[in-house]
């Protein structure tokens, strides 16, 4: 319902009519029959009773997964037939609800591209990997990924309601033989129990919301019994593939385990249905904050205007756009990949052009296991020791004067600085800024630069390159500052230049340094600074 239709409906209802109905709320919108709005159904399910259609177990049991199933509802292309006929294809399963959203006659339908295999899935591409994020490298026990200091990813199932063709975990997802047994799930919990730095657990898979309610609750209860686990998150596409699953019983169970957060996965505005709006409304009313993680996909959402429509519709149903991921280098996803520049173009078209709440972070999940790297357009043009030069989304260029009397934060007197949460082995750049170390060496750096020298070298003394007052590498204690030969404690010289007493200017009163003849005037070129 657009703004014109809402205005007309309000006028028709009359000013004195009660009770008030919020026609802007997507979860309360009505269809032509005056009943809650619903999405279309494919013709083969037109006569299915509503009580069956709205039963999530029925939706799971009636999923389409073969060429013969899908040609009942879609006019398949030769490319799709090739993909569906491949013996080693990634699993196919599509709920009746989700396949009904597809235009049966449009081979480029954006929902269709996400769930129907094509022949190009079978082609390898440069950089392709089975586990492009190296999750299994960061896995202390099967199904648990500990990549970041204070949080873990807990995979509790390999099953989903439907299967995305670009799935980053296609190496295990959809394969019932890869499911995690009770012993492995207990090992995941035991690792979390003995690792007190873990304060945040993300439940994923597969999709945890496909589990039987008792199994899901057992996992949640196990986590809530661990005192140092502060928040639990769930990553799920069930509200999108099968919104019927989000019923009162599930929401009542989830809210027992607060604080609880949930991220859904919507890629295109065509997925924004009345059913999804009502599912998200139920979750929000259960006190669960909602976010959205989407993937940038060629032929689906690689368009600024599609993305702007999507994020605006998401915030309307109280779902905050969280991440938009660059497509991973996984098997079967080559035809979905876009240049990173396309993602930057999309963020450029969102930031400033729509609400800040509607702008997600653009993320490249580093191949090889480097983790999530946020990428964004550059709004910092230049800087000096006293100001920065910035530009906004319109190209407006401005400067921000840095303060001249800033008193740095007193780390020695700060209880938080003196008692930080432990991040063993993962301080990274923060460790450099905190002064805990002065550089980061890549693996093999020392061996490479030894240049094969195996004998004692009279000039080589490792103590020469250990900085005073700083631990050069993580875990090293900083050496105390020495007393220099001048008798003064080591430290800054105050900025005095050689040949100039106490930093006095080398120029006379009123004089300025002049550029050499024929050279451009640097002051003119940097007048903003």
Predicted regions and their residues:
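Conserved AdoMet/S-adenosylmethionine-binding subsite of the radical SAM
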Residues: 186-200, 206-354
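C-terminal accessory regions of radical SAM enzymes
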Residues: 347-460
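Long, compositionally biased intrinsically disordered regions
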Residues: 6-10, 281-285, 376
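Flexible, acidic/Gly-rich N-terminal and inter-domain linker regions that tether
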Residues: 1-146, 481-485, 492, 500, ...
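Short, charged beta->alpha transition segments
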Residues: 139-142, 152-155, 186-193
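Short acidic, glycine/serine/threonine-rich loops at helix termini
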Residues: 166-168, 214-215, 246, 375-376
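C-terminal non-catalytic accessory extensions
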Residues: 2-3, 420-495, 499-529
């Amino acid at each position: 319902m657009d703004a014109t239709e809402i205005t007309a409906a309000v006028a028709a209802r009359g000013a004195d009519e009660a009770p008030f109905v919020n026609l802007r709320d997507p979860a309360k919108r009505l269809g032509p029959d005056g009943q809650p709005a619903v999405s279309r159904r494919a013709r083969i399910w037109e006569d299915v009773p509503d009580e069956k259609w709205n039963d999530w177990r029925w939706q799971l049991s009636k999923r389409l997964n073969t060429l013969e199933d899908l040609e009942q509802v879609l006019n398949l292309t030769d490319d799709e037939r090739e993909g569906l006929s491949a013996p080693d294809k990634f699993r196919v399963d599509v709920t009746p609800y989700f396949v009904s959203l597809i235009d049966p006659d449009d081979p480029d339908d954006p929902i269709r591209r996400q769930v129907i295999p094509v022949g190009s899935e079978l082609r390898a591409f440069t950089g392709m990997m089975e586990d492009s994020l190296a999750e299994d490298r960061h896995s202390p026990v099967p199904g648990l990924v500990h990549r970041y200091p204070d949080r873990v990813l807990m995979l509790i199932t390999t099953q989903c309601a439907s299967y995305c063709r670009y799935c980053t975990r296609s190496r295990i997802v959809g394969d019932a033989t890869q499911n995690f047994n009770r012993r492995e799930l207990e090992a995941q919990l035991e690792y979390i129990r003995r690792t007190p730095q873990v304060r945040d657990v993300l439940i994923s898979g597969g999709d945890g919301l496909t589990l039987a309610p008792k199994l899901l609750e057992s996992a949640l209860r196990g986590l809530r019994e661990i005192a140092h686990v502060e928040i639990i998150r769930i990553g799920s596409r069930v509200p999108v593939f099968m919104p019927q699953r989000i019923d009162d019983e599930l929401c009542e169970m989830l809210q027992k385990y607060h604080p609880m957060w949930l991220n859904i996965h919507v890629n295109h505005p065509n997925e924004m249905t009345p059913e999804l709006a009502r599912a998200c409304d139920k979750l929000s009313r259960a006190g669960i904050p909602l976010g959205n993680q989407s993937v940038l996909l060629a032929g689906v959402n690689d368009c600024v205007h599609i993305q702007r429509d999507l994020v605006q519709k998401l915030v309307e149903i109280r779902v905050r756009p969280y991440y938009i991921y660059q497509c991973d280098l996984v098997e079967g996803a080559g035809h979905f990949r876009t240049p990173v520049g396309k993602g930057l173009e999309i963020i450029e078209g969102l930031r400033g052009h729509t609400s800040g709440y509607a702008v997600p972070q653009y993320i490249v999940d580093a191949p090889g296991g480097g983790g999530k790297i946020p990428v964004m357009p550059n709004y910092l043009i230049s800087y000096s020791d006293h100001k920065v030069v910035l530009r906004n989304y319109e190209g407006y260029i401005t400067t921000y004067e840095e303060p001249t009397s800033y008193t740095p934060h007193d780390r020695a007197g700060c209880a938080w600085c003196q008692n930080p949460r432990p991040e063993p082995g993962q301080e990274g750049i923060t460790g450099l800024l905190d002064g805990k170390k002065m550089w980061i060496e890549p693996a093999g750096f020392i061996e490479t630069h030894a240049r094969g020298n195996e004998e004692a070298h009279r000039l080589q003394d490792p103590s020469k390159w250990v900085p005073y007052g700083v631990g050069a590498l993580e875990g090293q204690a900083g050496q105390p500052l020495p007393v220099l030969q001048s008798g003064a404690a080591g430290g800054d010289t105050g900025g005095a230049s050689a040949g100039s007493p106490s930093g006095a200017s080398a120029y006379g009163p009123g004089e300025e340094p002049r550029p050499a003849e024929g050279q451009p005037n640097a002051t003119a070129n940097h007048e903003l600074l």
